Amino acid sequence: MKDTFVEKVDDFVRQHDVLKERSTIVVGVSGGPDSLALLYYLLEKRAAKQFEIVVAHVDHMFRGDESHEDLQFVQDLCKGLGVICETIRINVSQYQKQYGMNAQVAARECRYAFLERIMKKYDARYVALGHHGDDQVETILMRLVRGSTPKGYAGIAVKRPFHNGYLIRPLLGVTKEEIVNYCNELKIIPRIDPSNKKEVYTRNRLRKYVLPHLKEENPQVHEKFQKFSMQMQEDEAYLQELAFEKMNKVITKKSDKQISLSIPTFESMSMPLQRRGIQLILNYLYEYKIPSSLSSIHIDKVIEFFKRTQPSGSLDFPGDLKIVRAYEECSFGFKQEIVSPFLQDLSVPGTITLSNGDKLVTEVSEDIPSDMNETVFVAKYNDISYPIRIRSRENGDRMSIQGMNGTKKIKAIFIEAKVPREKREEWPVVCDASGNIIWLPLLKRSAFAISKETAKKDKYMIIHYKSKESSGRIMK
């Protein structure tokens, strides 16, 4: 039986290219049968494969003396085996309250942070965990019942990037029963976590009431679920590539904390790519630390939000992420503090940097720019009173418009241009020393501006609006 177990794991490791020879492996060991079976399997292969083994154990301090005894058990075991052992006690309940998350998510974050630290300390290539085939079945069932993303429905990955190496699960090809039999043959007496039997947890109920029926239908059901998982992961990788490619054409603006997209262009994508496109945006903005409260329901909400007939509105997501729609554009970004009114003099020539990182640059020239687009303002030097002043908008602001009699409200210009309300407060209003509004960058020039057609040889004051926005590409 022992040889059969080892051979099955060998085949699985080889088939999925799980780990390479001459590697340092950090093994997560709780003291339970799964992690002990993994440790003993790797120790059996250590000499032939030239593995360096480091054991890592986390006491989450959920079970008082009992969990502390687990830690001591792992330390004593490693001492007897002559294996390096790194342990830590973490008050996960305190961490949970501090960051407002559920116990399982808090424990996972603390545990993975410790594993990453140990991986770095020993320059390890792999972190190995003891998830097995039954875990895979339970995970996929649980996500189907609760709802998840397409990536989530694929279940547990055999191998995925982690820190500067990989997180691997060599036992996904074997069942819990095979693991227990392997431990019995080696006369290993593992620690048992009583919480694994509590029926308050969905996973435990699936394990007790659903999994046995599936195994009655097919004793090798875990292999079918593993095959399903691999196919889902392969399909998902392809669709992710397509979504990434498409989204880089949909995105109109991108900064570290904000992404804007064109709704009509986004809606031209197929629904599978739309869902994945939203997920890519969330991954980028949350820096892959997606809040546990975020689910596929939120992605569906965004897609429904785009289909509404109202031209504007907003959604609030976990972690202070706000999604704001303004006509045919939608912006995803983190809530910012209220923009304070601003006033700043701009020398000629000179440069100022605006709060959003964009710049206004002035120059004096006898020639006008060849490209007189919305980012350029040109006036006769002597028609303007100096200094130039850059300020935030004020109630009642009006300006004379180039080629039009009378004046127009700045508010009306913003509305016509479909500028979102939150952007209006930080939009620069360019005035002269007499208080005349001479330019609303990117939107309207005043009657002080000259056109390319009417320009003659003269001395001109020129203002350029230079955006710091990077290209609309998102990170994978």
UniProtKB/Swiss-Prot annotation:
The gene is tilS. Its EC number is 6.3.4.19. It is found in: Cytoplasm. This is tRNA(Ile)-lysidine synthase. Belongs to the tRNA(Ile)-lysidine synthase family. SMART domains: TilS_C (SM00977). It comes from Bacillus anthracis. GO terms for molecular function: ATP binding; tRNA(Ile)-lysidine synthase activity. Its main location: cytoplasm. GO terms for biological process: tRNA modification.
